[in-house]
Amino acid sequence: MKSKCVLIFLVVVWLFNMGKGIGCESKVNAEMNISLSTWVWDTKKWMLNQEAILEKLQEKKVTNVYLQIDTDLLPSVYRHFIQQAQAKGISVYALDGAPYWIGPSGIEEQEAFFNWITAYQAEADDQQQFSGIHLDVEPYLYKSWENNRAKSILHYQYVISQAAVQSHELHLPLAVDIPFWFDGVPFKNSNGSGSLGQWVIQYADEVTIMAYRNHADKENGIAEITENERRWGRVLSTPIEIGVETMASDEGEYISFSAKGEEKMMQELGMLLTECQAENSPSSIAVHHFDSWLQMKP
């Protein structure tokens, strides 16, 4: 049975009433039950400034942190942080993964990660333990994706299926990042056939859709590009989280909220939640990533 460990907290979602002319004011139009998550990649910097990151996470009303594991840091550093975070209602997931995990050295890297987590969990008190595993593999960035797609997909599925077994042995939920376009990636192999996106949603306990667009509705907006994943999540009882980008991007002006600012991002997320309330609403919103989020203009 899948472990459903998504914590839903009351977060004020700002909608903005954009009037005409000068003097337009923003105001709260609605309150919705939704949790906020974020990725923390610069682990060493923040683990040496734990009071600062906890204060900022609370300011942003974050309830789930995906913390990349830096094994150069002592386990005691993580124990202290997680205990303080949990006391503030913040769950911490162990984050790792890389495109080369589907390559020849991937199995060894994955084993090393889970061995570290296993040893850590065994030594940590309940209030110091990770709340889940969060994988960000991005197999499409590995060199074999273009010249041997079928083999790459099969190796990726092995990574995810093994991670599911390893996570459940630790009694932890497995969360997986996938891009929104995985719904259109077909596969046919020993794992069956169908959409790769649907397969991941079936295998993982939680899935974050990297829906990197800076508008909620209209054509090619967040709501439209995540429609299939949200529907599959409802059918398969897998919580679907929607991820948005705050890093500057050279892939197009429609990708990131970096230039638009935090107020505009919250406005669009409010529109997304309003549109999705009737059917297949996301379980949570994830902001990528913590450092770039902090650097956004208001």
Name the predicted role of every residue range.
Residues 45-46, 70-155, 262-266:
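Substrate-binding cleft of extracellular glycoside hydrolase catalytic domains
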Residues 43-58, 108-124, 188-200, 263-276:
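Short, acidic/polar
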Residues 34-40, 65-67, 92-95, 133-135, ...:
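Hydrophobic faces of well-ordered beta-strands that scaffold small-molecule active sites
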Residues 39-41, 93-100, 156-193, 238-249:
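Aromatic-lined carbohydrate-recognition surfaces of secreted/lumenal glycan-active proteins
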Residues 49-72, 126-129, 206:
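Catalytic domains of carbohydrate-active enzymes, especially glycoside hydrolases
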